[in-house]
């Protein structure tokens, strides 16, 4: 299916690009999330009329994410978790736990924005975590996992 992207989509394209994707991806994800429209003549004409407005909205989102990234970048989050004597946690620290701790510090972060490439944190200590505020704004946050010995 040919679609017009209404915003930047990771690994697909930028605003205004006409790309071919699988029908299910377009119908079930991109179109319902208002990230794309079918590439018909009418949709292309309407897109060209709204292009400046959509670019302005995209620039505002990027500016807001950059401002939040400057505040959030380099910050440290402390999370207390029960741990054994050897420093391994009983359970793990997930992206939801990190997002919750960031929200308590006053940052608007969702769990889907926290990236843990090696999976949940299972050891006591400091860990570098990436937070993706926008497709172009990714900041590093230090998570200090403090073990409460049982």
Swiss-Prot record:
Function: Binds to the 23S rRNA.
Record's protein name: Large ribosomal subunit protein bL9
PANTHER family: 50S RIBOSOMAL PROTEIN L9
Disulfide bridge partners, by residue number: none
Cross-referenced InterPro entries: Ribosomal_bL9, Ribosomal_bL9/RNase_H1_N, Ribosomal_bL9_bac/chp, Ribosomal_bL9_C, Ribosomal_bL9_C_sf, Ribosomal_bL9_N, Ribosomal_bL9_N_sf
Annotated organism of origin: Paraburkholderia phytofirmans (strain DSM 17436 / LMG 22146 / PsJN) (Burkholderia phytofirmans)
Encoding gene, per UniProt annotation: rplI
Keywords: Ribonucleoprotein, Ribosomal protein, RNA-binding, rRNA-binding
Highest taxon in the source lineage: Bacteria
Signal peptide (UniProt feature, chain positions): none
Any one GO molecular function term: rRNA binding
Protein family per UniProt: Belongs to the bacterial ribosomal protein bL9 family.
